[in-house]
């Protein structure tokens, strides 16, 4: 952090494009750089350090979502505690009853250690706890088990603090062979040499029969944006059950904004060229309500009109 601070003092950027997704080998620390920028009164793209910290833990997100009365699948931690939103049936304590669970890292993103083997069908909760402990022993990171919901997965990208909900995307699993889990694992997300990467595309076109579901997804995305005070850019991930009910999986307050990432795909679908999309994100970072009141707590008299910012630095 000291080296980053020295570089920022030397370059004196008008705005920083924040691309920090992890620090010290863990995504749990991704709020550190935005917090540093706030102390230096330097505007930056994306969500505030407070929002990043609040969403760093997937369990913390789920707990806040439950308190807000929003739907999220039940989950189990390795200490044996069962958590539920009260909106989805779950088995009595001690019995998983053949339910399917997905094993997830608490803090790491980008489908960390997520593959077909992450979907388990357990006879009881003790078996789920054993599976979690194996994951934690292997990786040295905390994991949790979430009830596996349905076969449809949606990503809704959020732009700006208003917020603007970009066109919803659904992951198309139709090309996967029978029996293969309908998930976006590490290979599907990050390894272009794999079958999964090339056979889990996004789609943005929906039938009229899906319109009520799409509207509900947008409503939930806005509610999540307000709940976590999201700004700049963010993404909300959902699964949909057999009854058409959407469930909030994760709130990603720092999604990847590379050209081939889901957020930029949604921006393109909304009519933004890549350069225009970047300019839009910078504009949001330099808007008075963000760069002054939220980022620094006071006005920045040297800030010109957003489009005229000449000195932008990228931190990644």
Language-model segments: residues:
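Short glycine-rich anion-binding loops that position phosphate/pyrophosphate groups of nucleotides
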Residues: 21-23, 106-108, 254
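Short beta-strand elements
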Residues: 105, 160, 170, 252-255
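ATP-binding N-terminal substructure of ATP-dependent carboxylate-amine bond-forming enzymes
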Residues: 1-45, 50, 54-56, 82-89, ...
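Phosphate-binding site of ATP-dependent enzymes
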Residues: 123-219, 242-247
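ATP-dependent carboxylate activation and anion-phosphoryl transfer catalytic cores
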Residues: 66-69, 177, 207-316
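Active-site nucleotide/adenylate-binding loops and adjacent lid/helix of ATP-dependent enzymes
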Residues: 8-12, 52-144, 149-152, 162
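Hydrophobic beta-strand scaffold residues
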Residues: 15, 43-44, 72, 101, ...
């Amino acid at each position: 952090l000291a080296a980053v601070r020295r570089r920022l003092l030397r370059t004196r950027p008008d705005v920083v494009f924040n691309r920090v997704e992890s620090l010290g080998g863990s995504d749990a620390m991704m709020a550190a750089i935005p917090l540093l920028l706030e102390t230096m009164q330097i505007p930056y793209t994306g969500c505030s350090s407070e929002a990043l910290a609040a969403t760093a833990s997937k369990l913390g997100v789920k707990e806040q979502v439950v308190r807000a009365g929003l739907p999220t699948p039940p989950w189990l931690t390795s200490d044996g505690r069962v958590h539920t939103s009260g909106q989805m049936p779950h088995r009595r304590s001690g019995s998983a009853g053949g339910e399917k669970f997905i094993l997830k890292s608490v803090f790491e993103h980008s489908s960390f250690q997520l593959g077909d083997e992450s979907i388990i069908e357990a006879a009881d909760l003790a078996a789920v706890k054993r599976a979690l402990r194996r994951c934690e022993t292997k990786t040295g990171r905390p994991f949790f088990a979430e009830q596996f919901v349905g076969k449809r997965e949606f990503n809704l990208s959020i732009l700006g603090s208003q917020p603007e909900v970009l066109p919803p995307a659904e992951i198309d699993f139709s090309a996967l062979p029978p029996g293969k889990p309908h998930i976006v694992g590490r290979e599907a997300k990050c390894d272009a040499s794999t079958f999964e990467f090339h056979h889990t595309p996004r789609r943005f076109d929906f039938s009229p029969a899906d319109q009520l579901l799409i509207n509900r997804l947008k409503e939930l995305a806005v509610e999540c944006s307000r709940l976590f005070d999201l700004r700049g850019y963010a993404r909300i991930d959902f699964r949909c059950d057999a009854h058409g009910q959407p469930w909030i999986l994760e709130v990603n307050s720092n999604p990847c904004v590379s050209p081939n990432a889901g957020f930029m795909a949604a921006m393109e679908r909304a009519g933004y060229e890549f350069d225009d999309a970047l300019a839009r994100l910078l504009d949001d970072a330099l808007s008075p309500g963000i760069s002054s009141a939220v980022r620094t707590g006071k006005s920045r008299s040297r800030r010109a009109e957003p489009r005229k910012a000449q000195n932008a630095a990228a931190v990644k």
